[in-house]
Amino acid sequence: MTERVQNREVKVCPVVLRKSGSAVELLLFEHPLADVQLVKGTLELTDSSVESAALRELEEESGISKVSRAKYLGSWESGFQNQLWHFVLCEISENLPNNWSFYTQDDGGLKFNFFWHKLGDSPKFKCHKVFSSAIKQVEILCI
């Protein structure tokens, strides 16, 4: 796996869920240049674990740092650019709003607009095929 990490092919995806009545919702965001996405980033050689990388990416892209528990869910060969994704369930120790914006330092500073998507529902937003497939993978792992 070290070669894939060096090639920047190994991705970490912190999965943030919440209950809304009987539904389970997944945290997503609208990227100003690339439609709707899940929080995701690259596993670095300096990361001590997949879980620590997921926590780093979650904070970098959303500002969320109060994670009470990180649980490894599984991996997925995405079929996109030889990317291997690792999903990590991140339980948040605070109530998050329905929508919010976060200014990330990615690409010189971008505003990401966060929202919740009900798992099992058809997406009502535009996203790259790898992200729609990743959402389906989260549904398999979590519901």
What residue spans do the PLM features occupy?
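Active-site-adjacent beta-strand/loop module that shapes the phosphate/pyrophosphate-binding cleft
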Residues: V10, E77-Y103, F112-D121, V130-C142
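Conserved hydrophobic "DFG−1" position in protein kinase catalytic cores
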Residues: V16-L17, L28, C90, W116
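Short, charged/polar surface micro-motifs in flexible loops or helix N-caps
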Residues: S20-S22, L33-D35, C90-P97
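Conserved Nudix-box catalytic region and its N-terminal flanking loop in Nudix hydrolases
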Residues: S22-I64
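A short coil-to-beta-strand element that immediately follows conserved catalytic motifs
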Residues: I64-G74
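Short connector loops at helix/strand junctions that flank enzyme active sites
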Residues: E9-K11, L33, L38, Q83-W85, ...
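Conserved N-terminal beta-strand and adjoining loop/helix that marks the start
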Residues: M1-L26
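Short, P/G- and charge-enriched loop/turn segments at secondary-structure junctions
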Residues: M1-R4, S101-Q105
